[in-house]
């Protein structure tokens, strides 16, 4: 599980504010979602995907276990006047909602096995897993086994379980701006592996 710190929150917020990544990702997800859906953005981090999805769904529950990360989302919701997103501080892998979600989005969150277990318990409809393909991934907050978190590995898990799915590859840019040279050093220390 990703560990948030003051530095990682700041780096992610700076990057999210300077890219259209979440809007482009939302455009890729929309064909699988309905405007009437109550969507769970599972492991939402700072919630920028929830913000992008908010104008396309009835309600978004933005679930994240780190209160500091969710505070960024709360600030953005207030600043933008968005009322249909509910931040929820919880471990989504252990959470059981009162009513199952219409759809769940897992964006760079959890193993495929964790996603399947959570979705089975929490979702009655569409499950979307946005998987980073480690073949192209250069930085990581923790060591990863080569290929373990790849597009092909995710498809392999679904195939092994006999779960029907639609797969789509996409390449979206997510640049990281730095305020100072020291920021760049800190970033590379954290994510350089």
Named regions from a protein language model:
Residues 6-20:
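Class I SAM-dependent methyltransferase Rossmann-like catalytic core
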Residues 19-36:
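Conserved alpha-helix/loop element of class I SAM-dependent methyltransferases that forms part
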Residues 43-47:
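Class I SAM-dependent methyltransferase "Motif I" SAM/SAH-binding loop
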Residues 48, 55-82:
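Class I SAM-dependent methyltransferase SAM/SAH-binding core
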Residues 81-92:
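Conserved SAM-binding strand-loop segment of SAM-dependent methyltransferases
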Residues 110-122:
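A short, conserved alpha-helix within the catalytic core of class I
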Residues 124-137:
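Conserved beta-strand signature within the Rossmann-like core of class I S-adenosyl-L-methionine
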Residues 150-187:
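Substrate-binding/catalytic lobe of Class I Rossmann-like enzymes that use SAM or dcSAM, i.e.
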